[in-house]
Curated annotation (Swiss-Prot):
Extra information: Sigma receptors are classified into two subtypes (Sigma-1 and Sigma-2) based on their different pharmacological profile.
Domain commentary: The C-terminal helices form a flat, hydrophobic surface that is probably tightly associated with the cytosolic surface of the endoplasmic reticulum membrane.
Originating gene: SIGMAR1
Family: Belongs to the ERG2 family.
Bilayer topology term: Single-pass membrane protein
Function: May function in lipid transport from the endoplasmic reticulum and be involved in a wide array of cellular functions probably through regulation of the biogenesis of lipid microdomains at the plasma membrane. May regulate calcium efflux at the endoplasmic reticulum.
Ranges in the topological domain labelled Lumenal: 1-7
Biological-process GO terms, alphabetical: lipid transport; regulation of neuron apoptotic process
Organism: Gallus gallus (Chicken)
InterPro entries: ERG2_sigma1_rcpt-like (IPR006716)
Subunit field text: Homotrimer.
Site label Important for ligand binding, positions: 125, 171
Name of the molecule in the record: Sigma non-opioid intracellular receptor 1
Annotated region (Important for ligand-binding), positions in chain: 98-105
Length: 222
């Protein structure tokens, strides 16, 4: 009892501190100002749905830079990077990233599917081309989405996902973005061991963070 007592106390204090940290983070996410709005990204993508995806993406990037100057990565920092996660394989091009938001282009040139992941973030996908099938946890039927549709993945939700070859979309995420990286990088670390892709992914996210830091300090006149 004498040995277990201090150990139990430390565990209890640790859990209490962690709970307070989570509560504080939740409050911060709820009250902070966000650069983007889900409806804005969805409407912009919907406007170009049905076009050739490369043409649509180029138009979307131009419009985002006009609406959010200083918050979209420059052309020289845009790179399509493979993503292996949850058993599926796709490719993403990061446009914007911070601790609480991201905007990226995502898709696949082959049929692929797997587990969506469960995040501390809300994710909005608006389809430009192809089809997206989603099977939600606790249900016995799947739904298919088409160009122009927006799929909302709520925080804490898990689904089965499947994309047909040639499916491309615009994705907006809002929440504690670093919490999504564990899932996004797990297959790379423990399955494919494609450490070059790991480097590309972390480099893109770092560039996004640095761009946001620069934008923040510019508002302070630094």
């Amino acid at each position: 009892m004498g040995v277990a007592g201090p150990w139990v106390l430390r565990v209890g204090l640790g859990l209490g501190a962690f709970a307070l940290l989570l509560q504080g983070l939740r409050g911060w996410l709820a009250c902070k100002r966000y650069e983007f709005q889900p409806a804005e990204i969805a409407e912009l993508a919907r406007h170009h749905a049905g076009l050739d995806h490369e043409l649509a993406f180029s138009k979307i990037i131009v419009e985002l830079r006009k609406k959010h100057p200083g918050h979209i990565l420059p052309d020289e920092d845009l790179q399509w990077v493979f993503v292996n996660a949850g058993g599926w394989m796709g490719s993403m091009c990061l446009l914007h990233a911070s601790l609480t938001e991201y905007v990226l282009l995502f898709g696949t040139a082959i049929d692929t599917g797997g587990h969506s992941g469960r995040y501390w973030a809300e994710i909005y996908d608006t389809i430009i081309s192809g089809t997206f099938r989603q099977w939600k946890e606790g249900t016995t039927r799947s739904e298919i989405y088409y160009p122009g549709d927006t799929i909302v993945h709520q925080a804490g939700e898990a689904t089965s996902v499947q994309w047909s070859a040639g499916t491309w979309m615009v994705e907006y995420g809002r929440g504690f973005v670093p919490s999504t990286l564990a899932f996004a990088l797990a297959d790379t670390l423990f399955s494919t061991q494609d450490f070059i892709t790991l480097f590309y992914t972390l480099r893109a996210y770092t560039k996004g963070l640095l761009l946001e830091a620069s934008a923040f300090f510019s508002t302070l006149g630094c």
